[in-house]
Amino acid sequence: MTTAELTEMTELLVQYLQKNHFIQFDLKAVLFDMDGVLYDSMPAHDKSWQQTMDEMGLKHLPHEFYLQEGKIGQSTIDAVFQRNLHRDATDEEVKKIYARKTELFQQYNTGELIPGAIEILKYVQTKGLKPVLVTGSGQPSLLNRLEIHFPGVFTSETMVTAFDVQQGKPHPESYLRGLQKGGNLKPNQAIVIENAPLGTESAVGAGIFTIAVNTGPLPDSVLSEAGASIVFDSMGTLLETMPEIVRIIQTIRL
């Protein structure tokens, strides 16, 4: 990082501490979203949602499912139903639609990892920090792959999924649960790595310093407006910067 970039990063971290009334960080954990941060699965999610809604005769908006990323499935379905039919979906409709979406996702998902994801997780562990997964996903096919691709990194005790919360992102419940699973942490004892606006809102709402990585088609401004303190264009770029971010976090004090 250049001197100017280091200064800017320090200022962003100071602003976070001041806004949230902390004197310093006490970093213990890094909370990771899954889709779009660890796995390049969002194109498959988007395609399967679009096709499912098309088959149901329900209109959807450009990039709607990227913007809705992080919500639990029923909330995503209800948003489309409200706009098209002015009502929520019935339990039976939700079950049918989500089953079809899941079927299509399994066809389209390649299982590819986001470049840099493994390296960032390894770096986090070498620094003695705890990786915690915080995802709105309830897709068994993805959750089951975590142990294959990231052996020993995540356990049920360090994972928050759609099955663990009543209110999906952007409500802060997911990341508040992430703090609990990280060891009953305070917000200044963790940082978040997100890729989605709703996930960013959730993390910021939980009071955690939030880094966004824009791995999708949305403009950076959407993530900044959602509250991200800084936006990177890839996990690779974040990987290059991560040592300096951690160093500043561990030394800064108001």
Per-range role (PLM):
Residues M1-L27, K122, G138-L254:
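Asp-based, Mg2+/Mn2+-dependent phosphohydrolase catalytic module
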Residues T3-E64:
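Active-site neighborhood of HAD-like aspartate-dependent phosphohydrolases
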Residues Q15, F81-E119, K127:
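Metal-dependent phosphoesterase signature
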Residues V37, T135-S137:
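Conserved phosphate-coupling serine/threonine residues in phosphotransfer and NTP-handling enzymes
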Residues K47, T52-L85, Q107:
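Alpha-helical substrate-recognition element adjacent to the catalytic core
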Residues D54, Q125, V204:
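Anion (oxyanion) recognition and catalysis
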Residues E55-L58, L85-A89, F150-T155, N184:
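Short helix-capping segments at alpha-helix termini
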Residues L58, L129, I208:
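Short glycine/serine/threonine/alanine-rich loop segments
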